[in-house]
């Protein structure tokens, strides 16, 4: 049909038959106050200003008050940014040929960041849910995109007779990771189908999002946060593909 042809043109035309294949990696982490109190967002904002000189990054985006919220390395194109809230830091790495080279750069960034945060008794921690989520304000970064997201999630309070959870602010305290792989026109369907089949296994093997605010009895509460929120109002927005694709 005409609509299918348009979709194929939109999404498949940019797939290049290139022997050079790259990987893209994004990692999100909470920044916690090691005394168990709320994260001091001023500490994190100061960290971003510090990283500009410490790691030779440049400021790519600022919030409504001029505070740097996204930094980029002009050579590697690695970015360090706030993800939704000032208590979550994301590392969005530029394209790389191997995971190992990303790991090498990540280690350099983490060493500098953890050393600076330690001066204020804060640290990046490897949790899928911010350990002090109930102490933090859980407000969005002062930037239109993040305010829009949080406003949308808060619409759940207007949805009656539903099974939506009561934590619309979850966008400010959950973390995740993403990996993007280059594909070709000859293998993209095989890659999509492969990830569809391993996704549920992967989520259990690497589960680290246990939530203390509800009796959910799972270490992958991220699924509940997404599926039983405004994101899950439309089933197509959550979960994995319902079937394997042949064409």
Regions found by a protein language model. Give the residues of each.
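Terminal catalytic/cofactor-binding subdomain
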Residues: 1-167, 173
């Amino acid at each position: 049909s005409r609509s299918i042809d348009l979709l194929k043109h939109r999404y498949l035309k940019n797939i290049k038959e290139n022997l050079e294949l790259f990987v893209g990696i994004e990692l999100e982490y909470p920044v916690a106050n090691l005394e168990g109190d709320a994260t001091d967002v001023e500490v994190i904002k100061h960290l971003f200003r510090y990283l500009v000189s410490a790691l030779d990054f440049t400021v790519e985006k600022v919030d409504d008050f001029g505070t740097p919220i996204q930094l980029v390395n002009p050579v590697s194109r690695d970015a360090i940014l706030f993800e939704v809230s000032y208590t979550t830091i994301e590392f969005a790495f530029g394209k790389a040929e191997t995971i190992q080279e990303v790991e090498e750069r990540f280690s350099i960034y983490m060493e500098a960041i953890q050393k600076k945060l330690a001066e204020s008794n804060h640290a990046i921690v490897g949790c899928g849910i911010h350990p002090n989520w109930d102490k933090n304000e859980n407000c969005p970064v002062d930037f239109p995109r993040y305010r829009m997201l949080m406003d949308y999630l808060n619409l759940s309070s207007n949805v009656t007779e539903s099974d939506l959870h009561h934590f619309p602010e979850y966008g400010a305290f959950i973390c995740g990771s993403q990996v993007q792989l280059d594909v070709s026109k000859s293998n993209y369907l095989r890659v999509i189908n492969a990830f569809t089949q391993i996704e549920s296994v992967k989520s259990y093997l690497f589960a680290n999002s246990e939530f203390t605010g509800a009796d959910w009895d799972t270490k992958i509460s991220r699924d509940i946060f997404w599926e039983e929120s405004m994101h899950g109002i439309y089933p197509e927005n959550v979960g994995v593909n319902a079937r394997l694709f042949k064409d």
